[in-house]
Amino acid sequence: QEDPDYLKLWLDSFVSSYEQFLDVDFEKLPTRVDDVPPGISLLPDNILQVLRLQLLQCVQKMSDGLEEQQQALSLLLVKFFIILCRNLANVEEIGMCSYVNHVITITTSYIQQLKSKTKEKEETDQTPIEEFVRHALVFCESLYDPYRNWRQRIAGHFLSTVERSRQKYKPASLTVMFVPFFYQCFQESEHLKESLKCCLLHLFGAIVAGGQRNALQAVSPATMEVLMRVLADCDSWDDRNPEEESRKAELTLKCLTEVVHILLTSSSDQRQVETSTILENYFKLLNSDHSALPNPKRCRQWESRFIALQIQMLNTITAMLDCTDRPVLQAIFLNSNCFEHLIRLLQNCKVFQGHLDSLAVSTIQALTAVMHKSPAAKEVFKERIGYAHIYEVLKSLGQPSRELLEELMNMAVEGDHMAVGMLGISNVQPLLLLIQWLPELESHSLQVFISNWLRRICCINRQSRATCVNANMVIRVIETLNSHSALHSSCAENLIALLGSLGSQSMSSEELLQLIRLLRTEEPDRAHPYVVPVMRSILAMARKQGMASALQYFNLKHSMAGIAVPSIHKWPGSAFSFNAWLCLDQDRVDPSMSSKSGKRKQLY
């Protein structure tokens, strides 16, 4: 305390010895080192008090501007605290002291300088100030996300609940200065470097990922306003740092995903912001009207970047719904009128010249995520929007790509459409849409590809055939075959083979009549090209294949399905029996059940 030069020398030596623990780059995972920095008890007596006074002196001199030596000392102090926090046993004690408040005060002043556009700033080297800011933000990360959960998440490593429960040390309590600091940093920040904004977003994500208590304190109306404004600022993107701009948007969306997940695990009295409010602002931004922008701003390059942002936002919806409380979040999405917003996005995107297909693919992915394994969501979509409407909207975008058609196939099986045999039909409506779209496809190769896949997925087992028959697929196929001049011969053969398989399951007299009418020609002397394949189909329907099976049966596939036997009021004896035939369909293997024990149905 009496010899500042010796103190600086000691700090230099300490920081040099443990420099590998600094890990200032948020984009990189922390360095794994066997050794750890010393605990506080092993440091010289009163060293923390001395350092606190040194920091306080720096704060007091900020108004007049720090000299070069004082700037170097303040940076050394922050590095020292980062290193100390890498010994997780020190985090709680350091967090309880006033160091972080002093550091935030200095950082706020520096960021104000970096945000300004003055001649003095342009003539002065800003590197020392930027270096301090980066280290200050990492110091805060060390306090509030000691296990670097956010960095793990950014790198694609998702920690399970069990792994999180094994984290022995808790993060320090979040300082009340953080929310005002974070909000102020993004006020009038057009001259602040995008890389520093990314660091601020990294810190926010780290606080939310570090622990629920701090997350609920950080997730406030002010911070949510900042995140939404960062996304909305895409209008002012320039050509100087497009990669950093894109990364900023990506980090903001990852922060929002983390926020939604943390809000789902909290009670209403703990939350400052409701998930529904976030989604309302999110969809409003996703569907914002940019047609009023002046033409110079709406250049082709700007359109490309804006659509890229919309695609990122759509993909984020899928990421948000990838959580343990998915049914709860799906209900919140439904209450936020997400289907209407997503369909409106497809309708409005026609103002742009290109990238329509990519946007349509991402929109279908988002719709699939909202409806995934939720009969209620599927019913809501059917009632509010309807597949006839989405068909018209998609058709208005022009000829579809293979990727878009494959996404509709994925929607039908709620998984990878190539896993035929592993996945059955979860949503039959997209299949009807694909059948209806076949005559409109100019590409014959796409017609053959789609029809061949439809034939395989719809006929894979008894359950799939029953699902398709109950959805009136037979009539839809016959209607499509009526446009035979627009269909490739192989496509027509696949559809007729599909008819034969579905007809062997069930076919009404009206459907059979429609099939026969299909063979009429305007010229009596010329046979219809479908005569031979249709006759084969009719023979396949009539032919008995395998063991005779019941024409009517109960479907007990659903986990909650069962047969209720009426209660017996008077027992004829000591017990009673209930007889039923059981048919086990072995064609379908559910991958989700492959690693689990078998299910058992009980009779109540």
Model-derived regions: residue spans:
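Short carbohydrate-recognition loop motifs
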Residues: 541-557
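Short linear interaction motifs
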Residues: 200, 323, 555-565
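Elongated alpha-helical scaffolds that mediate protein-protein interactions in large eukaryotic proteins
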Residues: 1-535, 540, 544-546, 591-592
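Extracellular glycan-recognition modules
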Residues: 87, 531-535, 558-604
